[in-house]
Regions:
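Acidic, PIN/NYN-like endoribonuclease modules and their adjacent C-terminal/linker elements
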Residues: 46, 106-166
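Active-site-proximal, substrate-binding regions of enzyme catalytic domains
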Residues: 2-97, 103, 110-114, 153-166
């Protein structure tokens, strides 16, 4: 199983939906930069915080800081701190997949040639391998209760790809 580097939105979303364990089933280790950890756990009661703490205590989620490099400084000028650290760490560990939802972060990852997926990608994979019976209820929960943003076109495409009715 591969190791992944996660940005905050994936941990928050999957944690809030009670699906953070999907990451444990797919990846040997989830690496989280300090700025991402702070974002996920800062409020203490933020959706996904308790689940992230549990994953860290179980040892499959680990904190890992990127090196302080000119690249990190450059990324911090255009992205939030968590995304910048996640992308910088991904350049240090090119065998790792990046978990990332933010459009600006994904665009930068594309430009840098980094492999990534996001919350929706994890849910679709879980459905495909039988670890999640349906994507729609989880996606609806994220959109309705946890401010997960997904446009109508993408929402419909995801459900089609999952073989689920609108």
């Amino acid at each position: 199983m591969p190791t992944v580097i996660s940005d905050a939105s994936v941990l928050i979303g999957l944690g809030a939906a009670g699906q953070i364990e999907l990451l444990r089933g797919f990846y040997a280790q989830v690496l989280v930069p300090p700025a991402v950890w702070a974002e996920v756990t800062s409020a203490g009661t933020r959706p996904g915080a308790a689940e992230a703490h549990a994953a860290k205590n179980q040892g499959w989620l680990q904190l890992r800081a990127p090196a302080a490099t000119p690249l990190l400084a450059h990324l911090r000028r255009t992205l939030d701190a968590g995304e910048a650290e996640a992308l910088a760490l991904a350049t240090e560990l090119p065998e790792c997949l990046l978990l990332l939802d933010d459009a600006d972060g994904r665009e930068t990852a594309l430009q840098m040639g980094l492999d990534f997926t996001g919350t929706v990608g994890v849910l679709l994979r879980a459905k495909r391998v039988g670890r999640l019976p349906a994507v729609k209820p989880v996606l609806d929960q994220l959109v309705q209760h946890h401010r997960f943003r997904v446009g109508r076109t993408l929402y419909e495409a995801v459900l089609r790809q999952a073989g689920e009715a609108l």
